[in-house]
């Protein structure tokens, strides 16, 4: 496979490059709004590494009963992503190595979901996503109780 960039792709990306930092800053602001809305609740956002500055290409959360939550949110017009459904130790390149039990990785792979994230996501949109997400997760908790 040849994955080199052609001249047109290079020109487009070169034109976008000056905006990269402002887009990353906007994504960090959106992530901060998510963190504010979801703090202390049943939805856990993946933590930033201390001393780092996250680019927030994705905003990954851990939720119980992920597949039902995704279906319910989709019915409400909120699309989510599933970017890491298989833990690393279960992926093809690692199958030849010693098999180990990694229950935390297995659990995380079953709970993680990518929430809507783009630089210009409005405060009202973040609020709606968080409210619907919390309602959905809390409804599942009350069904179990």
Question: Which sequence ranges carry the predicted segments?
Answer:
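PLP-dependent aminotransferase class I/II
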Residues: 1-145
């Amino acid at each position: 496979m040849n994955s080199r960039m052609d001249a047109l792709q290079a020109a487009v990306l070169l034109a976008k490059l000056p905006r990269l930092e402002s887009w990353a800053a906007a994504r960090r602001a959106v992530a901060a709004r998510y963190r504010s809305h979801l703090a202390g609740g049943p939805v856990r956002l993946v933590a930033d590494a201390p001393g780092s500055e996250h680019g927030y290409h994705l905003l990954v959360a851990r939720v119980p009963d992920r597949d039902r939550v995704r279906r319910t949110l989709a019915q409400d017009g909120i699309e989510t992503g599933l970017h890491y459904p298989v833990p690393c130790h279960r992926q093809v390149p690692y199958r030849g190595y010693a098999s180990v039990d990694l229950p935390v990785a297995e659990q995380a792979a079953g709970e993680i979901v990518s929430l809507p994230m783009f630089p210009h996501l409005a405060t009202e949109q973040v609020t709606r996503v968080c409210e619907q997400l919390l309602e959905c997760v809390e409804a599942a908790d009350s069904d179990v109780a």
